[in-house]
Design a protein with these regions (language model features):
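DNA polymerase sliding clamps and clamp-related checkpoint/processivity subunits
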Residues: 1-41, 45-181, 187-283
């Protein structure tokens, strides 16, 4: 099964190069890709990455099983995307992948590919990365040694939320950073037209009330006015979330009683990542 997207009118394409690969993906959106790797390496040490004709997926939990990351980058959003199999699953050490991706310059074109010789009976031994800079006529190729993928494939649960809030990503980052100085726990509450952030520590307590306003906070979905939605969450874990801040200007926050908090970031124009955090047990 083969599917490809080609938006490379202004990029050089080597058809013989693509013919030698079971997977070829090309993008010029370098900064968001690096930001994504920076965030994921602190949440997922090792993970499966699934490539299918429609795009790239990661669905995995951190080691403590309190954070679930769900990433989908659509094939149509890349400059070039060709996956010649119905599904290719690889196992990756995210810190090692980050070390390779982190050396790329913003002016480079990134090609992610798997050579036919590295794909044997569905098992992939290496993931290749090519950094091309047309200005200085430089091409760097790196090959990451892969690990054995996890046999169990997780699914993202289909859950209904009563409250979905749109909020500037920079504002959410500042709230988490400010309150992390005071406490280890954060209560998030959705009441009427307000979103409330509340915490208490050994030397201080703090409360931030955020109301709807044009161009800032707004409810995408609002719960019944008589319903209060609240949960308590680890600020340390939320500090991992805000490493995604530079991916987009606005985030969506999903809230429901007794369910994980979900924060959705757009990965520039490539797709989105949802980060889910289990609530702390009631004290």
């Amino acid at each position: 099964m083969s599917n490809f997207v080609d938006k490379t009118q202004n990029l050089p394409l080597d058809n013989s190069f693509n013919d030698g690969n079971v997977l070829t993906i090309k993008t010029v959106q370098i900064a968001p890709f690096r930001t994504l790797m920076t965030a994921l390496k602190d949440i997922l040490l090792e993970t499966n990455i699934t490539f299918q004709p429609d795009g790239i997926r990661i669905i995995n939990m951190d080691k403590s099983h309190t954070i679930l990351a769900h990433l989908f980058l659509a094939a149509k959003n890349f400059e070039f995307y060709e996956c010649k199999k119905s599904k290719i699953v690889i196992g990756v050490n995210m810190f090692h992948l980050f070390k390779l991706i982190n050396s790329i310059d913003n002016d480079d074109t990134l090609t992610i590919y798997i050579e036919n010789s590295d794909y044997v009976d569905g098992i992939v031994s290496h993931l290749a990365l090519k950094f091309e800079n047309g200005e200085i006529k430089q091409c760097k190729t790196q090959k990451l040694r892969l690990i054995e993928p996890e046999p169990e494939e997780l699914e993202y649960p289909d859950v209904k939320f009563s409250s979905i809030i749109n909020l500037p990503s920079a504002d959410f980052q500042k709230i988490i950073r400010d309150l992390s100085c005071i406490s280890e726990k954060l209560e998030i509450k959705s009441v009427g037209n307000e979103l409330i952030f509340k915490c208490s520590g050994q030397f201080a307590s703090a409360e931030i009330h955020r109301a709807e306003s044009d161009g800032s906070m707004g409810f995408v979905l609002k719960q019944d006015s008589s319903k209060i939605i609240q949960g308590e969450f680890s600020l340390k874990n939320l500090s991992y979330f805000i490493k995604c801040t530079n991916l987009c200007n606005q985030i969506e926050v999903y809230l429901e009683n007794d369910l994980p908090l979900v924060v959705k970031y757009d990965v520039a124009s490539l797709g989105s990542i949802k980060l889910c955090l289990a609530p702390l047990p009631s004290s």
